[in-house]
Amino acid sequence: MHMNICLLPGDGIGPEIVAQGTKVLDAVARRFGHTVSTSSALIGGAAIDATGSPLPDATVEACRTSDAVLLGAVGGPKWDDLPSEKRPEKGLLGIRKALGLFANLRPAALFPELAGACLLRADIAAAGLDLVVVRELTGDVYFGQPAGIETRDGLRTGFNTMIYDEDEVRRIARVAFDTARARKRRVCSVDKANVLATSRLWREVVEEVARDYPDVELSHMYVDNAAMQLVRWPAQFDVIVTGNLFGDILSDEAAVITGSIGMLPSASMGSGGPALFEPIHGSAPDIAGQDKANPIATILSVGMMLRLGFGLAAEADAIDAAVRRVLAEGYRTGDIMENGRTLVGTVSMGNLIAERI
């Protein structure tokens, strides 16, 4: 198979970690007889510095004509004083919209080799943590209109609109059920249906979709309880599906309790065009250019790209196995370093994983 990948290195540590991701991708291609072509485009702060825009038209076109997109990270304090519409993060929101990416899949798994880093009580961690948060990306209170700040009766008043239509709910629910079907066949839909009309529609539509998946178990949970249950007993979850706002919060919570946020990948997918794959961590400008960044989340994002973007499960499994082997051999970047382990830098970690493909 030939794969045409658009690289968006972005800001901070982005270029360093994307370089390691492509190194591992090349190793996979050699082993399995594939070919890869890559092109790089600007996004975020790097794009602002070069063009004045966080998402140049040329970047959108490069992404649209690719088979998949691999992103590093965007943002940094250098651009914090810009107007909100000109900041680096607008580039990420913009490319998601331009590519029609409505579903964000964020796995949160506890690596046995890093069990000591888990923030949960030992008995809870021992029960395991292996779940996926499927978050709707393009609707909800983040994009609903009207929204703004205005003066009412002499008082400044802020307002947003939480809104979903049934088609938006239906398509994200199908992604969740399809994801669960390839895992442990359990979906937990998270909402606030006891208070919000939006959530009542959400629950109704998810139940309608569930009828097409009789082999998948569906449960419902209010978001406040879900936040508690993620800490209390995360082993109960397989796939969590929820809206944009709740998903933003819960996916970060699920990630951080693993204790190794530098290890976790993500995918943003649409309905037919190229998908976008990226690590969940930020641009870490404080360590940029110092060979300190952990590239494993980006490398695992390449694995997600192979699995979800190209249907290459064996190739994705090879990446997962190589990462586990390197960790089992005791190699660590600074963010996951433990006593008695071997400290390595960004490039060395990429080399070690690529050599074990």
UniProtKB/Swiss-Prot annotation:
Superkingdom field: Bacteria
Compartments reported by the entry: Cytoplasm
Binding site for Mg(2+): 224, 248, 252
Source species of the chain: Nitratidesulfovibrio vulgaris (strain ATCC 29579 / DSM 644 / CCUG 34227 / NCIMB 8303 / VKM B-1760 / Hildenborough)
Chain's role: Catalyzes the oxidation of 3-carboxy-2-hydroxy-4-methylpentanoate (3-isopropylmalate) to 3-carboxy-4-methyl-2-oxopentanoate. The product decarboxylates to 4-methyl-2 oxopentanoate.
Keyword Nucleotide-binding tagged: no
Pfam family, one: Iso_dh
Site residues by UniProt (Important for catalysis): 142, 192
UniProt KW Nucleotidyltransferase keyword: no
Record GO cellular component, one term: cytosol
Name this protein carries in UniProt: 3-isopropylmalate dehydrogenase
Binding site for substrate: 96, 106, 135, 224
GO biological process: L-leucine biosynthetic process
PROSITE patterns named in the record: IDH_IMDH
Database matches in PANTHER family: 3-ISOPROPYLMALATE DEHYDROGENASE (PTHR42979:SF1)
Keywords per UniProt: Amino-acid biosynthesis, Branched-chain amino acid biosynthesis, Cytoplasm, Leucine biosynthesis, Magnesium, Manganese, Metal-binding, NAD, Oxidoreductase
